[in-house]
């Protein structure tokens, strides 16, 4: 019997229900994935008991000799994986990583260029309610009105006009590969530093499917889950000359003690991402996304930018007379989990936008391929085009339950928290 089951039945029941949801359905939120059993074991290890404020060899607590080894391994592996000069593995999240970089190179009120949240950016790229938009003068760039790809004519114009101290590249809902070299050219022209937030596509960079921002950017931030398949956490990489300020603005600037059990999980994640198996995985993620996108297009759905280069796509569900909120609910009834999402130049409200965001990282981790993507694409179209047909939705849900039996969720069977 699990310790959780015997000690806290209410939490146990919730974990069991979530396990069933993950196993019986299709997880297609682009930012979600499954970690390996080794990473889950590390995150649940005895390292969670240890406080370790400071950095390896320079701690404010005793007894850190073993966690120093863990953190040093994580740093070295991050640098090797991405070819970075320096790395900080302590950020608790991607947002914390971004905040630390901002503190390292900006003063309150400084001007920054970042992608508009409504056109694919992230909250930390200048959203007015976020700390980034409250502390700094963010000027937003966007995408072209016709092809929905980054509008570099606009980016150049804004950079020349506003002379930002920092340019932020990266996105949370942009289905195309980002040309980091182009951003570097613009940053150099106007004398700005360049930060790339590759949280969504870091795994594709690690697998050498997408171009790396590391040679071009002063700072690179990322989460370690999503396409990297690690624990939920963050990472900063930078030029060696920036490391001292980055370290200072992670600790003590924005955080206290690091989560050493999560740092261990990150170290394992970085090692996994250097394997040949992982390179195949990265390619499969992109191949699956393109197959799914092609299927949806052939059914008559509209995709932002006409398709995808990476792990995600944005579907304009107004083509089937739906809003994103109902589309999300309809697919959820079928056992397909996605999220409603704004699309470029959206005329609807953020809480009921025109689109949904769909991703393939989690399903690819489960071992699904092109044949499954074609079936899933057809299910998505059938459900959305007959959105009030509860019987159809239940039928799709049954078919999905049957299909996924051949694709178990990694780590679920090994975790004591999911075994009665």
Curated annotation (Swiss-Prot):
Site (Plays an important role in substrate specificity) residue list: 225
Domain of life: Bacteria
E.C. number: 2.1.2.1
A GO MF term: glycine hydroxymethyltransferase activity
SUPFAM superfamilies, sorted: PLP-dependent transferases
Primary localization class, coarse: cytoplasm
UniProt enzyme class: transferase
Keyword entries, A-Z: Amino-acid biosynthesis, Cytoplasm, One-carbon metabolism, Pyridoxal phosphate, Transferase
Pathways involved: One-carbon metabolism; tetrahydrofolate interconversion; Amino-acid biosynthesis; glycine biosynthesis; glycine from L-serine: step 1/1
Cofactor(s) the protein requires to work: pyridoxal 5'-phosphate
Entry-annotated residues carrying N6-(pyridoxal phosphate)lysine: 226
GO cellular component, one term: cytoplasm
Residues the entry annotates as binding (6S)-5,6,7,8-tetrahydrofolate: 117, 121-123
Subcellular location: Cytoplasm
InterPro entries: PyrdxlP-dep_Trfase, PyrdxlP-dep_Trfase_major, PyrdxlP-dep_Trfase_small, Ser_HO-MeTrfase, Ser_HO-MeTrfase-like, Ser_HO-MeTrfase_PLP_BS, SHMT-like_dom
GO BP, sorted A to Z: glycine biosynthetic process from serine; tetrahydrofolate interconversion; tetrahydrofolate metabolic process
Oligomer status and interactors: Homodimer.
Family recorded in the similarity comment: Belongs to the SHMT family.
Protein known as: Serine hydroxymethyltransferase
Source species of the chain: Rhodopirellula baltica (strain DSM 10527 / NCIMB 13988 / SH1)
